[in-house]
Amino acid sequence: CGALAHHIGETNAARNTVRATLLAWGEEIRSGGVDAIVVNASGCGTMVKDYGHLVADDPELADIARQVSAMTRDISELLAELPLETIIDPAPEGRGAVTYHSACSLQHGQKIHDLPISLLRLAGYDVRQPLELHLCCGSAGVYNILQPEMAEGLKRRKLANLEKAGAPIVAAGN
């Protein structure tokens, strides 16, 4: 998707990846064979949804980039539109407790927070949310590589908050 190159400032590499992706997807979209682009990695989803802005100044790619951005959906957005209550058979006693960690790129980049929680509840889970759920876990693309000491502190804080929530399982939209 070009996100990692974009995060480290490799603008040409990112644009080359974005260009190749848009040209390939554009061909498929023009053929009428694409209803949506569904992404299950929130960092890539955020990047692809931003393609329209990233190449807005490129006359060859701007239109298809806007189309791709508009067609791109996080998996939770797609699942929320399906009649899952007719498909999912929740356990009568529930499935237990799960703490939901909302990745920064999902909750801040794509503004998606409640959908994954609703889906987990629909499946029968007792969803718990950690304290400071809005704070970074320390990864942030390549932040953990470029700023390992700062990232380690953020990670420890996030892990402590996840543990305090008390569920044996952590679910993440990434």
Provide a role label for each language-model segment.
Residues 1-174:
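Iron-sulfur cluster-binding electron-transfer modules in prokaryotic oxidoreductases
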